[in-house]
Swiss-Prot record:
Gene3D superfamilies: 1.10.287.3980
Domain of life: Bacteria
A GO CC annotation given for this chain: ribosome
Gene designation per UniProt: rpmH
Keywords tagged on the record: Ribonucleoprotein, Ribosomal protein
The name this protein goes by in its record: Large ribosomal subunit protein bL34
UniProt KW Transcription keyword: no
UniProt cross-references to PANTHER family, sorted A to Z: LARGE RIBOSOMAL SUBUNIT PROTEIN BL34M, MITOCHONDRIAL RIBOSOMAL PROTEIN 34 FAMILY MEMBER
Compositional bias ranges of the Basic residues kind: 31-44
Listed InterPro entries: Ribosomal_bL34, Ribosomal_bL34_CS
């Protein structure tokens, strides 16, 4: 059985990156929440 986590920098960026977050209203809400909480890193 292969491992479930097969890292790919490109897929990671496309799904969880800053531009992906900014592309949707919900994604912008995620960023706003993380800014309000004072997260050091907003996205991956």
């Amino acid at each position: 059985m292969k491992r479930t986590f097969q890292p790919s920098e490109l897929k990671r960026k496309r799904v969880h990156g800053f531009r992906a977050r900014m592309a949707t209203k919900a994604g912008r809400q995620v960023l706003a929440r993380r800014r309000a909480k004072g997260r050091h890193s907003l996205t991956v």
